[in-house]
Amino acid sequence: MGLLSIIRKIKKKEKEMRILMVGLDNSGKTTIVLKINGEDTSVISPTLGFNIKTIIYQKYTLNIWDVGGQKTIRSYWRNYFEQTDGLVWVVDSSDLRRLDDCKMELDNLLKEERLAGSSLLILANKQDIQGALTPDEIGKVLNLESMDKSRHWKIVGCSAYTGEGLLEGFDWLVQDIASRIYMLD
């Protein structure tokens, strides 16, 4: 996000945030968006392309871009980076065999200049499944401690199925973004 975008948001006080939600396929991105919005999560289909959900959260309007995570779609993720205020990376904490892929894709995202100023929330999802790695274990696998010190980030354990941890994560994300782009509040 450039300086002009920040100034524009301060001046207009538009109270909108653009959130990009990505992660490998079947990590729970769509379920999380629906759960936060209080919608039915009993029947979820894989996201082929993207969905945009606009929700009011606290006193802000969140435009959440839920982008499919299939291998064939990942090369298109870069089309959604512009003007992203917050990046949500969703990890299936129970899918141990794909954690290397997960780390590689996150590393690639974090190299993107257009995402450099975005707050990063890592949701260690599926904590309700026996054998799932804890958020600390996921953090070690993803090597989060080596991340650029200027990046604002947080990892939160959650369950899209039960809803546990989702509010904690989104509360942090919204407050972190607000403290950066709505400085005059």
UniProtKB/Swiss-Prot annotation:
Disruption phenotype: Embryo lethality. Embryo development limited to the formation of a few giant cells lacking microtubules but not actin filaments. Failure to localize KNOLLE in mitotic cells. Giant nuclei and nucleoli found in both the embryo and endosperm tissue. InterPro entries: Arl2, ARL2/3, P-loop_NTPase, Small_GTP-bd, Small_GTPase_ARF/SAR. Expressed in seedlings, leaves, roots and inflorescences. It comes from Arabidopsis thaliana (Mouse-ear cress). The keyword Lipoprotein applies. Has a role in the cofactor-dependent pathway of microtubule biogenesis. Not essential for cell viability. May play a regulatory role in sequestring TFCD. Gene3D superfamilies: P-loop containing nucleotide triphosphate hydrolases (3.40.50.300). GO terms for biological process: embryo development ending in seed dormancy; embryo sac cellularization; endosperm development; tubulin complex assembly. The gene is ARL2. This is ADP-ribosylation factor-like protein 2. It is found in: Cytoplasm. Belongs to the small GTPase superfamily. Arf family.
